[in-house]
Swiss-Prot record:
Protein name as annotated: Dihydroorotase
Lineage: Bacteria, Pseudomonadati, Pseudomonadota, Gammaproteobacteria, Enterobacterales
MF (Gene Ontology): dihydroorotase activity; zinc ion binding
InterPro entries assigned to the protein according to its UniProt record, in alphabetical order: Amidohydro-rel (IPR006680), DHOdimr (IPR004721), Dihydroorotase_CS (IPR002195), Metal_Hydrolase (IPR032466)
Organism of derivation: Serratia proteamaculans (strain 568)
UniProt KW Hydrolase keyword: yes
UniProt catalytic activity: (S)-dihydroorotate + H2O = N-carbamoyl-L-aspartate + H(+)
EC top class, as a word: hydrolase
Sites of N6-carboxylysine modification: K103
Underlying gene: pyrC
Family in the record: Belongs to the metallo-dependent hydrolases superfamily. DHOase family. Class II DHOase subfamily.
Binding positions (substrate): H19, L20, R21, N45, H140, L223, H255, A267
Disulfide linkage: none
Amino acid sequence: MTAQPQALKIRRPDDWHIHLRDDDMLKTVLPYTSQVFGRAIVMPNLALPITTVAAACAYRDRILAAVPQGHDFTPLMTCYLTNSLDAAELVNGFEQGVFTAAKLYPANATTNSSHGVSDVKAIYPLFEQMQKIGMPLLIHGEVTDAAVDIFDREARFIEQVMEPIRQQFPELKIVFEHITTKEAAQYVQEGNRFLGATITPQHLMFNRNHMLVGGIRPHLFCLPILKRNIHQDALRKAVASGSDRFFLGTDSAPHAKHRKESSCGCAGVFNAPNAIPAYASVFEQLGALDHLEAFCSLNGPRFYGLPVNTDFIELQRVATTQPEEIAMGSETVIPFLAGESLSWSVKA
């Protein structure tokens, strides 16, 4: 029997999907990301969405001002696509190096997505421009038709929206974000080099039974919602395969405790404090620790055409109990796996 490794050294990872929020929440949550990750794709769905170069620059400045001294972190900004977005603004932002990618939210699919796109085909001209300049499209892949069951919305999105986009724009770089189903995993695996996907730690570790059996666990509620175990298993097999189509995207999405624990709680899991140890635990369970570095640190930069980070982090086999809550002024935020123990930790 092979001895278990006591330490792992991997190239510094990047987070290809994160919500940093703004104001006090930004200042509270950012250090958990900036101390471990070199870069992060920052979601643009603030209360006032990021739809202009000026707004992206201002938000980037607020993020950089909140980075603790000694952390070397680069936020990668995204543009929120709307029905009326000016193509010139999108192109200029990308060519100036302000926008790294553009984000497609189907209207009302998730938090702060009411400004999202109601008719995807109406913004095909934007996709044409993006394909021409090599700008990646990041997609929250769920239909929002009220007649479609919430557990079926991702699979339905593939046939109704994703495949038509890819047929029309075969060389448009697309990230199918936070995939949650066996259909999505298979679709990405069978795709080409223009299609990639991010996978969160919660969708690898849990399924809907964990959220709903024996009482509702609101801090596991996120969108896309946790699915049944056959889908969880498909995601685990996808990352264990070593395929370079899949890469790290935490979708860390913090909300104040009272907004999660309410009669109509918000969707989002705040996993930034322990994402890397959580991923490491999953990869170890799958006997796939040799693929952890590629998933965390190599596949994403390769897809985006960016250099990999030059420095490294070290994980240690030190069991660590996760905090029950994190203070944010007079409020608190509940982290992923609160009060539970993980067998890996990132060396400070």
